[in-house]
Amino acid sequence: MLVGLHYLKHAYNVSDERVVEGYLENPYWQYFCGNEYFEHDLPCDPTSLVKWRKRIGSEGVEKFLEETILLGQREGEIKDQEFRRVNVDTTVQEKAIAFPTDARLYHKMRQALVKEASKENIQLRQSYKRKGKLAFIKQGRYFHAKQSKRANKETKRLKTYLGCVKRDIERKVENPNIRLKSLLEISERILTQTKNSKNKIYSIHAPEVECISKGKSHKRYEFGCKVSLVTTSKSNWIVGVQALHGNPYDGHTLKDAINQMEKVVGRRPKEVYVDLGYKGKDHHPEDVQVHLSNKSRKNMTRWERMWMNRRSAIEPVISHLKHDHNMIRNFLKGREGDRINALFAAAGCNFSKLLRAFFSLFLKDYISPSFSFAI
């Protein structure tokens, strides 16, 4: 049942709570999840889906993607020849965080330290609860009014408040617990990082978030992790997806993407079509022919030109993954959550294609061609 609920969740782009409610009112969803009779009670608590995802991990979620490919092969929707040519590209899976600013990081970090100190019964000299809130509000007002000197002064004041609280806790606690120790380490990184620092902290609750720039005019920076995607060139079936941390160069991810496809599908492609981000033959697999999009079309045959034109077909797949299958904003925690959400989104996309294939077959076999709707 939980397997079916997760397929439906990412196929229809709904939350854990909504998929459980939809199960209760939709007999087709109940039949898909294995029920023989209609039920009038919720199948489980939405938190059960969270616990189940943690238990199976990303290795278990990879089986979801593998099963959609196997089902497509059994039903004749995916031919073996399709695995010969694939398209590979990368995108950014954004994390569910607020846009990071220095003032917000100082303010939120101080609040987190004060809250944890209260749980541990640590008597702080001063918490700066009222002063910190007032300084944060003033900073936002001054910045909005383009009064940068006043805004920077309030930002510096927020940084001072955070440093005072951090040092006060360190003086009074010699052996902090794991949670408090982690917060103190994050606060130290926030206080010491500068504009040109590497591996900066952009979120308190998601310190693994990276800042990635893909050259988009409408969105200069994206905060999350890079995702590598492999699709078949002909029919756009997703045969591989990986969440990559550390913002690696696209060319360095190609071998791992092909290896994951081999793990999921059971065979390696013969030809791979990529964009200019994959330049550098040193990073390409030796047994796979890699076609870069910078090759002159005049020197291509008609057949080669046709397949090269199909490379851009992966772009709408990325858009569908984000806007239709829960990958535009990841709410799952940690790096493992990034991997799980990317795999579930890919499995949901393939499952939607299988549903469309089933209904098109149903309309073809059971509805007469002469049938017309009355207007």
Regions found by a protein language model. Name each.
Residues 203-220:
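Flexible, glycine/threonine-enriched loop-and-boundary segments that flank and lead into catalytic domains
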Residues 216-264:
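Electropositive, glycine- and tryptophan-enriched low-complexity nucleic-acid-binding patches
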Residues 19-32:
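DNA-recognition alpha helix
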Residues 187-190, 259, 304-375:
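Basic, amphipathic alpha-helical segments enriched in Lys/Arg and hydrophobic/aromatic residues
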Residues 266-336:
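Helix-centered, glycine/charged polyanion-binding patches within enzymatic domains
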Residues 5, 19-20, 45-49, 84-94, ...:
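Short, conserved catalytic/metal-binding motifs centered on acidic residues
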Residues 36-208:
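Active-site- or DNA-interface-adjacent structural scaffold in DNA-acting proteins
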Residues 1-4, 11:
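Basic, short loop/linker segments at the boundary and entry of helix-turn-helix/winged-helix-like folds
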